[in-house]
Swiss-Prot record:
Function text: Catalyzes the dehydrogenation of L-2-hydroxyglutarate (L2HG) to alpha-ketoglutarate and couples to the respiratory chain by feeding electrons from the reaction into the membrane quinone pool. Functions in a L-lysine degradation pathway that proceeds via cadaverine, glutarate and L-2-hydroxyglutarate.
Example GO biological process: lysine catabolic process
Family to which the UniProt record says this protein belongs: Belongs to the L2HGDH family.
Protein's name in the database: L-2-hydroxyglutarate dehydrogenase
Induction: Expression is induced by RpoS during carbon starvation and at stationary phase. Is also regulated by cAMP-CRP. Repressed by CsiR. Makes part of the operon glaH-lhgD-gabDTP.
InterPro entries documented for this protein: FAD-dep_OxRdtase, FAD/NAD-bd_sf, L2HG_DH_bact
Catalysed reactions listed for this entry: (S)-2-hydroxyglutarate + a quinone = a quinol + 2-oxoglutarate
Enzyme Commission number(s) from the entry: 1.1.5.13
Organism: Escherichia coli (strain K12)
Entry's Gene Ontology cellular component terms: cytoplasm; plasma membrane
Coiled-coil zones: none
């Protein structure tokens, strides 16, 4: 019997595993991952941005964890020899309406304690000669990294401290009892843990349902499609270039990202995926589609964002529409500059009343902790999210009437934060 089993080998699961074994070095800990390697889904299919925390409601978990995670991610990379580029982010306004929205973002960045600089049109042009706009906000702390590399380093640390990673282990059933949790996999494996931690991303709601519980949310998969610019445009921008987001839209808009390998990507958009892990336009699951369209919450989201959703779908099917979104602030680009690049799928939790759950969300039972909503900036925030989960583990252990083996914490969660922010 394990003391802890963690489900999910993305960056949240690996961060949690690494920090949990640091706090409880004598614990028997296993991480189950359904793929043959870590970071195969959301972690390995995002833009790699180290976010600063510009957009998030002051005081929210997203705002707190993103600010802490920005520093912790860079510190972790420094400590483990992982390359990153602290290139900064430029938010660009291209109309009077966007200038008004940019002023609101300026106030929010102040409330979130983020260093930033206001630029007029001339100053913007001086910093970014190929970008057109009425003004911008420069955020120097934003950067770029390979979160696959970060996750791989976390996995190596976890294993070096005695943790066990079991790949090709897709969870098919959970049974919680008074002394622990039994975990069954499609491959025929059976594991038992005193405490279970689920960091299951696109499958988060299904793991809660396996316990016989109604999760109170459903995961809606949104595919984010990217292009890569032709190599001759690798120097077209000096920073990450973001449009000013439309408050009516749930996502940040199509942006230009300087990748860690020197290439520049365009994207992502946000298109409803008809399969939980539907990375290609043609990917379709009848059961997943029935589940999506059978959800009153998702139907309300689609109704509330009908116009923008149809626009996203049109631009997904028509490359010229996608291009126009980028040409608003980078008119130099043409259709031939947009080359194919792998898509990602976002796991967005939706409430029954049709609200996109805006903050990170965790659900606990006497023996389990579930990470239920961890969209962007979860990768940036992975280290503080992991520490937050470890704190929840400590609370759970203290409340258990029969906690199993006595585990002594070798260090506090506060010490974890300090270690990653030296």
């Amino acid at each position: 019997m394990y003391d802890f089993v963690i489900i999910g080998g993305g960056i949240i699961g690996m961060s949690t595993a690494m920090q949990l074994i640091d706090v409880y070095p004598d614990a028997r800990i296993a991480l189950l991952e359904k793929e043959s390697a870590p970071a195969c889904h959301q972690t390995g299919h995002n833009s790699g941005v180290i976010h600063a925390g510009v957009y998030y409601t002051p005081g929210s978990l997203k705002a707190q964890f993103c600010l802490a995670g920005n520093r912790a991610t860079k510190a972790f990379c420094d400590q483990n020899g992982i390359r990153y580029d602290n290139c900064g982010k430029m938010l660009v306004a291209t109309s009077d309406l966007e200038m008004e929205r940019m002023r609101a973002l300026w106030e929010r960045t102040a409330a979130n304690g983020i260093e930033r600089e206001w630029l007029n049109a001339d100053e913007l042009r001086e910093r970014e000669p190929n970008i057109t706009g009425l003004g911008g906000i420069f955020v120097p702390s934003s950067g770029i990294v390979s979160y696959r590399d970060v996750t791989a380093a976390m996995a190596k640390i976890f294993q070096s401290r005695g943790g066990e990673i079991i790949y090709n282990a897709e969870v098919s059933g959970l049974n919680e009892h008074k002394n622990g949790v039994v975990i069954r996999t499609r491959q025929g494996g059976e594991y038992e843990a005193s405490t279970l931690i689920s960091c299951s991303g696109l499958m988060a709601d299904r793991l809660v349902k396996m316990l016989g519980l109604e999760p109170g949310f459903i995961i809606c998969p949104f595919r984010g499609e990217y292009f890569r610019l032709a190599p001759e445009h690798n120097q077209i921008v000096n920073h990450l270039i973001y449009p000013i987001p439309d408050p009516a839209m749930p996502f940040l808009g199509v942006h230009l990202t300087r990748m860690i390998d020197g290439s520049v990507t365009v994207g992502p958009n946000a298109v409803l995926a008809f399969k939980r892990e539907g990375y290609r336009k043609r990917d379709f699951s009848f059961s997943d589609t029935l589940e999506i369209l059978g959800s009153s919450g998702i139907r309300r989201v689609l109704q509330n964002h009908l116009r923008s959703g149809l626009g996203e779908m049109k631009n997904s099917l028509c490359k010229s529409g996608y291009l126009r979104l980028v040409q608003k602030y980078c008119p130099r680009l043409s259709l031939s500059d947009l080359q194919p690049w792998p898509a990602g799928v976002r796991a967005q939790a939706v409430s029954p009343d049709g609200k996109l759950i805006d903050d990170f969300l965790f659900v606990t039972t006497p023996r389990t902790i579930h990470t239920c909503n961890a969209p962007s900036p979860a990768a940036t925030s992975a280290i503080p999210i992991g520490a937050h989960i470890v704190s929840k583990v400590q609370t759970l252990l203290a409340s258990q009437s029969n906690p199993g083996r006595t585990l002594r914490a070798a260090r506090s969660v506060d010490a974890l934060h300090a270690a990653f922010n030296q």
